[in-house]
Amino acid sequence: MGARASILSGGKLDEWEKIQLRPGGKKRYKMKHLIWASRELERFALDPGLLETSEGCQKIIRQLQPSLQTGSEELKSLFNTVAVLYYVHQRAGVTDTKEALDKLEEEQNKSQQKTQQAAADKGVSQNYPIVQNLQGQMVHQSLSPRTLNAWVKVIEEKAFSPEVIPMFSALSEGATPTDLNTMLNTVGGHQAAMQMLKDTINEEAAEWDRLHPVHAGPAPPGQMREPRGSDIAGTTSTLQEQIQWMTGNPPVPVGDIYKRWIILGLNKIVRMYSPVSILDIKQGPKEPFRDYVDRFFKVLRAEQASQDVKGWMTDTLLVQNANPDCKTILKALGTGATLEEMMTACQGVGGPSHKARVLAEAMSQANSAIMMQKSNFKGQRRVVKCFNCGKEGHIARNCRAPRKKGCWKCGREGHQMKDCTERQANFLGKIWPSNKGRPGNFLQSRPEPTAPPAESFGFREEITPSPKQEQKDGELYPPLASLKSLFGNDP
């Protein structure tokens, strides 16, 4: 306890206890924070005695800083505490933790700039993975397993979508041809795509050999041979030769050249894996403009065209392939509108309010079409006729003429139209009484039968007709003539 408490004393301890944990906060650093920091250093297998000097704090900072991205909250708190303690030893007069961290970052940036400037003055390349060792020699550091794992994960998750190319470019920064071949060899699947990539590399290597022919005669002593296309691809050159080419004077950036060939092949693969043309990207009738823009630029990244052509596609096709609602808005903005202005103007298109407005307009158009169809209907309208006055255009209930007495049908008094016994006219326009034979649209006489009467076999009793029926039948059917004249003596 005593040793840990003796890290600071006197004026430094007073300055330590004045520093705030957070900007504008009430809590301040105390002795217990130093005791906790020394215990944490022991847990991380570091010497707590390093906290007693500014040089020791600087060593702890260099040791802990690479682990901040993946470290726990305790590790970050320990780093912050050591950074504040470092400036207490320096008598820098910091007031809170954030100020100490900002000051530390500023110092590290200045130190890095000085290192890069000194390396540039000496003509030494600092590109990873070729670095300079303590003896001043340029050595190669292999790609870390974490870098290779990130590349394999991108291929597995994204296949060969357009975002694979910038990811490859970032992971292969400063790499040698050997490193680039290592990245390509880690791709397990997609062998058809890898074969396409090899074909592109071979074509570019042959083009390099054509444009850079080998000079006749042996190379001058002390001078390296010029790289061939296969040397740039890493198949006929060693790692040491690649390093010498990349760090020579003048340098030959074989890594960057090979990387450019690979990206050219990846562009062809992305094009194959993204068969959709930019001309086919059109906004759906209910699709939000933001989703349409996302799809448009994703396919545009896969297009093998210059930046000027892509700019023309953006200015022309983005508006041309929008749906009618967005197209109307975009044309009103004019040709000089930025993408931000377009997305802001079309923000509500496709949303609930816009859908309701479009639905209301569609229903209004449908109703107007129905009304026009009704107005154009050429069928005859039903004529309304008044039973009271006999005029057309109104009914009896609305008639202003004096009320007619009696039946509206026959004109007689004593009954209403619903009780009228007068027959209506048939479809021939003739009225027939009910007691004067058959209706006028039926035959008034029947043809006389020529067959003999049916024989009776005694299966049922004959029905005796009534006198009235006989009289009626006598009127309708006159007696038949004798049939003896027809059949002679036939019994």
UniProtKB/Swiss-Prot annotation:
Region: Interaction with host PPIA/CYPA and NUP153, residue numbers: 185-223
Ranges for region PPIA/CYPA-binding loop: 213-221
Residues in CCHC-type zinc fingers: 384-401, 405-422
Chain residue ranges for the region called Dimerization/Multimerization of capsid protein p24: 273-359
Any Gene Ontology CC annotation: viral nucleocapsid
Gene3D superfamilies in alphabetical order: 1.10.1200.30, 6.10.250.390, Human Immunodeficiency Virus Type 1 Capsid Protein, Immunodeficiency lentiviruses, gag gene matrix protein p17, Single helix bin, Zinc finger, CCHC-type
An individual GO BP term: viral translational frameshifting
Chain residues carrying a lipid of type N-myristoyl glycine: G2
Positions where Asymmetric dimethylarginine occurs in the chain: R381, R403
Domain notes: Late-budding domains (L domains) are short sequence motifs essential for viral particle budding. They recruit proteins of the host ESCRT machinery (Endosomal Sorting Complex Required for Transport) or ESCRT-associated proteins. p6-gag contains two L domains: a PTAP/PSAP motif, which interacts with the UEV domain of TSG101 and a LYPX(n)L motif which interacts with PDCD6IP/AIP1.
Leftover remarks: HIV-1 lineages are divided in three main groups, M (for Major), O (for Outlier), and N (for New, or Non-M, Non-O). The vast majority of strains found worldwide belong to the group M. Group O seems to be endemic to and largely confined to Cameroon and neighboring countries in West Central Africa, where these viruses represent a small minority of HIV-1 strains. The group N is represented by a limited number of isolates from Cameroonian persons. The group M is further subdivided in 9 clades or subtypes (A to D, F to H, J and K).
Stated name of the protein: Gag polyprotein
Organism: Human immunodeficiency virus type 1 group M subtype F1 (isolate VI850) (HIV-1)
